Structures are given as C-alpha cells and as structure tokens.
A protein has these predicted regions:
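Active-site-adjacent structural elements in enzyme catalytic cores
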Residues: 1-246
C-alpha cells in the first residue's frame, strides 16, 4: 500500500531522531509514505522525515485542494505547495501496529477488507480491531492517539443531517446514487453510486455546501451511503461531521 494513503503507528525506539514535539508526548510515532508526486519530490529534496500536521483548523472539514487550505489557514502559514486536488479525497487509513494485534484507529483511503486480505496473505489471520470513539463532552480521559477520533470532527459550520432521501426548503441535499441532490447546488457525491467517486468528492462537496449555506440559517442533508468497502470511511467522516460539537 506504500506509497499511498496508509499510516502505521509504531513504538518509538530509543535514539529515534524524530523530534519529541511531533509525537504529542506519546511514546509512539506515525509513519506514512505519500504517493503524490509533489510530496515525493519534497521528501527527496529534504532527505529527511517531514512532520506533516493536518492543513486545516482542528475539527473542521478536511481540505482536498490548495484553495481549501488557504481558506482555513490564510495568514497563519507562509507557503502552500499546490499538488492539485487530492486523488483519493479521504485521509489515510491509520493502523496501530505497536501492540500484539493490528488496531484500526481510523478508516480511510484503503478499505478494511483490503488490509485484512494483505495481513492474511502475510500469515496474520487476526481481523482488525476497532478503537473506540472519544467524546470530549463527557470528560472522557482517554487521550486520542490518532487524528479524527473525537466524536465531532470534519465538521462544517452548518448542521448536518444524515441518511436523507429528500430535502426540506432549508436544506442543501448532497445526493448519492438514486437519491438526487437538491437545493442551490443540487450536487451528488456520485450519481452512479460509485463509492470511490464519492470518496473523492466528499470533502470538496462539503466545503461547497458549507459555503452556500453560510449565514443563511440553512443546513446540509446527506443521502444514505452504503457501508461497504471504502463506504466505511465515508460514513465515519459523515457521522463525525453530523455529531454534536465537542
């Protein structure tokens, strides 16, 4: 899966040269090898690991274009390296490999089934274990060990209603498959019910819907998305986008 959207969480070894500041005080380190050609070139030029935090305000919709990054962080960063729209749309799948069994910390651009198949072909027959969602509203003492574990995350300013098949007069409906989009933009994640296309469009369309409803009191409705394959990751993002704000 490397280069590609897979992050592995490993135990930090004694003498590890990576700065402690990048591990948020944890004794683990997360490693990924991006496939984007511009990111690959940057790594070659730097010739060292790069600490890469999320390029958006915490808790808000993830960026999938340079314009999204500029909209969220303008005035706070010196440079944006524009490699074009994200091909996968979703963030990486995060697997914790620091213990006795692999743990799925965040579903993402590589589906659970594909990873389990790869593990089985390597002689690892255990299924991926899910990590619990963390709810900061209830004073949950558990510290997040990966991005996107809080109940509310990836959230637009507008409220979000899931599994909608029709839209009210005050909603912007993003469709999928047989459920057509409605509202000012009338968008669909995928008119052909293609989950990969839906993943690619997910955050870009959430950004568009949030922009068109801003200051109007209108909200966002989302058509049902199957939980198969990469649909698990899409629904993970949508549930967190729709959750009460922490």
């Amino acid at each position: 899966f490397w280069p590609g959207p897979l992050t592995l969480v490993l135990n930090r070894q004694p003498g590890c040269p990576v700065a402690l500041l990048t591990t948020a005080g944890l004794d683990k380190i997360a490693v990924r090898v991006p496939a984007n050609k511009h990111a690959q070139r940057l790594l070659q030029i730097c010739d060292m690991p790069i600490a890469a935090p999320s390029a958006n305000p915490s808790g808000r919709i993830s960026p999938s274009t340079a314009d999204h990054v500029h909209g969220g962080l303008a005035g706070q960063i010196d440079l944006i390296l524009d490699g074009g729209p994200c091909e996968d749309g979703l963030e990486s799948t995060i697997i914790d490999c620091s213990g006795s069994a692999p743990v799925l910390l965040r579903p993402g651009g590589i589906a659970r089934g594909a990873i389990e198949t790869a593990l089985q072909s390597a002689g690892v027959t255990v299924a991926l274990i899910d990590t619990p969602t963390i709810n900061s509203q209830t004073g949950d003492p558990q510290q997040p060990v990966a991005p996107g574990q809080l109940r509310s995350h990836y959230a637009p300013e507008a409220g979000v209603r899931l599994n909608a098949t029709t839209a009210s007069a005050t909603e912007e409906l993003i469709g999928f498959g047989p459920v057509a989009g409605a509202g000012q933009l009338a968008m669909s994640f995928s008119q052909t019910a293609d989950l990969r296309e839906a993943a690619t469009n997910l955050f870009a369309m959430l950004h568009q819907a949030d922009a068109v409803t801003a200051g109007t009191g209108r909200t966002i409705a989302i058509a049902p998305i199957p939980d198969d394959g990469i649909g698990e990751a899409i629904n993970d993002r949508l549930r967190r986008a729709a959750a009460p704000r922490d």
